[in-house]
Amino acid sequence: MIRISDAAQAHFAKLLASQEEGTQIRVFVINPGTPNAECGVSYCPPDAVEATDTALKFDLLTAYVDELSAPYLEDAEIDFVTDQLGSQLTLKAPNAKMRKVADDAPLMERVEYMLQSQINPQLAGHGGRVTLMEITDEGYAILQFGGGCNGCSMVDVTLKEGIEKQLLNEFPELKGVRDLTEHQRGEHSYY
């Protein structure tokens, strides 16, 4: 469910050493399955463990996950990264905003999941996003761009060289992608 790197475990163990004996960590998602989902890690003293929690035992600690958060923390990773600028704890939870869909789910759901979990986080760096409008009977994914992607001069490259290649690689049943957006260049446009 959750992978915690050795460096992150060591960091948590150091923090836990100054807490009440038996205190571990809790990993959770607030507003799971929504665009406002946020992940967090907190101390979990022994009296805060619920019977419905999942206990994930690691070498140096135990991480507790509540039953509501559990499906949204599938494939989550926690790491402790150190570079020239210092150290930071990172928590990546690709399914926090949308539950992972089954491999045999309808094509529309699988494409939507990939857009939300893999493509949109990349576009968000430019203030952009893409929405799946439909999949045609001919096998084309019809997309609409928003935010910084709307009116961006690089949108065709993003569509064909980025999004289309990733989608066709993952979903061979698709024939391609088409852009439905009425692009209007403005202050919001990234390029």
Swiss-Prot record:
Pfam families per record: Fe-S_biosyn, NifU
Binding-site residues for [4Fe-4S] cluster, renumbered to this chain: 149, 152
Cofactor(s), names only, from the UniProt record: [4Fe-4S] cluster
GO BP annotation list: iron-sulfur cluster assembly; protein maturation
Keywords, sorted A to Z: 4Fe-4S, Iron, Iron-sulfur, Metal-binding
SUPFAM superfamilies (UniProt xref): Fe-S cluster assembly (FSCA) domain-like, HesB-like domain
Family the UniProt entry places it in: Belongs to the NfuA family.
Function noted in UniProt: Involved in iron-sulfur cluster biogenesis. Binds a 4Fe-4S cluster, can transfer this cluster to apoproteins, and thereby intervenes in the maturation of Fe/S proteins. Could also act as a scaffold/chaperone for damaged Fe/S proteins.
SUBUNIT field: Homodimer.
Name used for this protein in its record: Fe/S biogenesis protein NfuA
Species assigned in the record: Cronobacter sakazakii (strain ATCC BAA-894) (Enterobacter sakazakii)
